[in-house]
């Protein structure tokens, strides 16, 4: 029986604005079949909200934290703070906000 969908909420700290990080995150999330968004925050972080199968969310989190990818992750990630919950709303696709 497949696992229920999960919601990953991740706050990405570092030099992650103005470097293509949200675009890169969107591409990886779509490749993994996730829905949600990546949004710049006023304090310089990027907020990533991704919903879908938990294993896909775990893979995205690994990539956000520095897992090997091609193309390589833009910017510099110092820390990722993540939280898991049940999906709270329905998203169409994955967008940059």
UniProtKB/Swiss-Prot annotation:
It catalyses: an acyl phosphate + H2O = a carboxylate + phosphate + H(+). It is an enzyme of class 3 (hydrolase). It comes from the Bacteria. Residues 7-97 form the Acylphosphatase-like domain. InterPro entries: Acylphosphatase, Acylphosphatase-like_dom, Acylphosphatase-like_dom_sf, Acylphosphatase_CS. GO terms for molecular function: acylphosphatase activity. PANTHER family: ACYLPHOSPHATASE (PTHR47268:SF4). Belongs to the acylphosphatase family. This is Acylphosphatase. It comes from Mycolicibacterium paratuberculosis (strain ATCC BAA-968 / K-10) (Mycobacterium paratuberculosis). The gene is acyP.
């Amino acid at each position: 029986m497949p696992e229920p969908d999960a919601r990953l909420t991740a706050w990405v700290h570092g030099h992650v604005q103005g470097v293509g990080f949200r675009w890169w995150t969107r591409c990886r999330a779509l490749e993994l079949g996730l829905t949600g968004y990546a949004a710049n925050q006023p304090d310089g972080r990027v907020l990533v909200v991704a919903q879908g199968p938990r294993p896909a969310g775990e893979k995205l989190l690994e990539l956000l934290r520095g897992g090997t990818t091609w193309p390589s992750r833009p910017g510099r990630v110092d820390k990722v703070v993540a939280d898991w919950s049940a999906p709270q709303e329905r998203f169409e696709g994955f967008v940059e906000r």
